[in-house]
Amino acid sequence: MKHLTEMVRQHKAGKTNGIYAVCSAHPLVLEAAIRYASANQTPLLIEATSNQVDQFGGYTGMTPADFRGFVCQLADSLNFPQDALILGGDHLGPNRWQNLPAAQAMANADDLIKSYVAAGFKKIHLDCSMSCQDDPIPLTDDIVAERAARLAKVAEETCLEHFGEADLEYVIGTEVPVPGGAHETLSELAVTTPDAARATLEAHRHAFEKQGLNAIWPRIIALVVQPGVEFDHTNVIDYQPAKASALSQMVENYETLIFEAHSTDYQTPQSLRQLVIDHFAILKVGPALTFALREALFSLAAIEEELVPAKACSGLRQVLEDVMLDRPEYWQSHYHGDGNARRLARGYSYSDRVRYYWPDSQIDDAFAHLVRNLADSPIPLPLISQYLPLQYVKVRSGELQPTPRELIINHIQDILAQYHTACEGQ
């Protein structure tokens, strides 16, 4: 299964193609992605982050083996071939254990890598950029690279032990700021300099040599950099190709390497395409997909209020608000301002902290209630036009069934379509 290496080879040969990575564990988002890839006959890259999924369960409660089982079961149920499915691990390193001494955090990171590789994840992002409890801030390139090389060695040994061959594909480096959208209001963003990118690569090459890992260098397919794209709660910093041109040209000197861009959510279709052309050819997307899910659910909740007596309604939006207020740990440190500003952010922020709450049993029950209420009889077309106008066009043309589930999935697929088009190449 060398989809990624082949994509990089084609890109380096001038095809201007790429691949997008779906970074979500939500079943409806994953179903939308699997069905979209199936319809377009493309491989599908699905990634779990070290926050979501780890050897202790992460915030989803899933280990890497659990996550793989969950995704593969869904793929099987949708007749999607498993050899077209690529699983990736994102920001794998001591990220979850920064409050521990480095020795302890890295021991946990070793086990994290083992658990991802043993579970069959093939795209491994090694990220040891974060300082642990007893580390200097920031870490030097050399320390970051030494730790990444240590984890690469663990990964290679684990892969050979479990699968009899070493066929992992690696991503190194990190973006600034932190994963998952910026906390503060942004106006402009520093693009990674070519010198900084070169220094990261050279430090890693040297560290890998010291670990006897020269042979895996061609399988290091991408470097994570900041091309100047980011979003905060209400704003998006759009890609400006001129500012990233020196960085873009620099990677042309490396035969088997492209860039990976994080936080590409909410970029325009034109910006996504230009990113791929400029060699930022792995595009990560996550919050934009759960944002689309949330949009569709809010629209369906509004339709429900028009059609169903108040006492029989699901009350999804109120249930969501009540649970978020009752358990504020996922949004409290991110959303600021007065009560109204925080209320709006909880519902509508681009950073989409609401995504952490969908698995809650009360919210899931309200979601199921909403779908039941709207599945009993056809949704009137004028209401679909009012609240889901993009889906209305497809319903009218006969290409989309106007059921709650299909409307949600299609709304998510509108975002996936932008990424697919950006990555198609010439």
UniProtKB/Swiss-Prot annotation:
Q: Which organism is it from?
A: Escherichia coli (strain K12)
Q: What else is known?
A: In contrast to E.coli strains C and EC3132, K-12 strains cannot grow on N-acetylgalactosamine and D-galactosamine, because they carry a deletion and thus lack active PTS systems specific for these compounds. Therefore, KbaYZ in K-12 strains is not involved in the degradation of these compounds.
Record's function text? Component of the tagatose-1,6-bisphosphate aldolase KbaYZ that is required for full activity and stability of the Y subunit. Could have a chaperone-like function for the proper and stable folding of KbaY. When expressed alone, KbaZ does not show any aldolase activity.
Q: What's the family?
A: Belongs to the GatZ/KbaZ family. KbaZ subfamily.
Which SUPFAM superfamilies does this entry report, sorted A to Z?
Aldolase (SSF51569)
What is the protein named?
A: D-tagatose-1,6-bisphosphate aldolase subunit KbaZ
Instruction: Indicate the quaternary assembly.
Output: Forms a complex with KbaY.
Q: Which GO terms describe its cellular component?
A: catalytic complex; plasma membrane
What lineage is this protein's organism placed in?
Bacteria, Pseudomonadati, Pseudomonadota, Gammaproteobacteria, Enterobacterales
- A GO BP entry: D-tagatose 6-phosphate catabolic process
Q: Which GO terms describe its molecular function?
A: enzyme activator activity
Instruction: Give the metabolic or biological pathway.
Output: Carbohydrate metabolism; D-tagatose 6-phosphate degradation; D-glyceraldehyde 3-phosphate and glycerone phosphate from D-tagatose 6-phosphate: step 2/2
